[in-house]
Amino acid sequence: MVKQMPGNRVVLISLLQLRKSTLYPGPDSFPEYTGYGGCMEEPKLIKVVGAAIIKDGKVLCAQRGAGKSLAGYWEFPGGKIEAGETPQQALQREIEEELLCEIDIDKKVCTSDYLYDFGNVQLTTFLCHLIEGMPRLTEHECIEWVEPSQMPRLRWAPVDHDAVTRNSGMAF
């Protein structure tokens, strides 16, 4: 550390001298960090799945409804993985429940994590195709078929950003 002294003299102060000063009392003066379970609790891990459903070169995007966390944000439809389910089973179930249609799961796009104030959401997004029915609103505020290049213009839930980036550059 360099300290300017009267008369324009420069004095080097060693880190050891600084540590001994009252400005920095040293690590012994602070409570010991014990990691998760000590000072902080480990965030709840919430595993969810999302479907990037493709039809006629467009991707189905869903806007979260009022009264839900992240209301007004866009997402790929899907939901939580229940105990004993594979991600694919959870996605099939969630799409049937939320959109009243059936999908064929093609391939995994990506898995991403985002730490929200309510927990750590781990989203696995799959590329999917409609096989029966047309998506209908049951839980979302709005659903839209969007050109992949236009997807970044929507206000997406943070955990969906990686999948949006990967899908927006694709041609279906």
Where in the sequence are the language-model features?
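Short, Lys/Arg-enriched N-terminal segments with co-localized hydrophobic residues
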Residues: 28-39
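Conserved N-terminal beta-strand and adjoining loop/helix that marks the start
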Residues: 41-59, 80
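Conserved Nudix-box catalytic region and its N-terminal flanking loop in Nudix hydrolases
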Residues: 58-97
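Active-site-adjacent beta-strand/loop module that shapes the phosphate/pyrophosphate-binding cleft
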Residues: 102, 112-134, 144, 148
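NUDIX/MutT-family hydrolases
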Residues: 127, 136-167
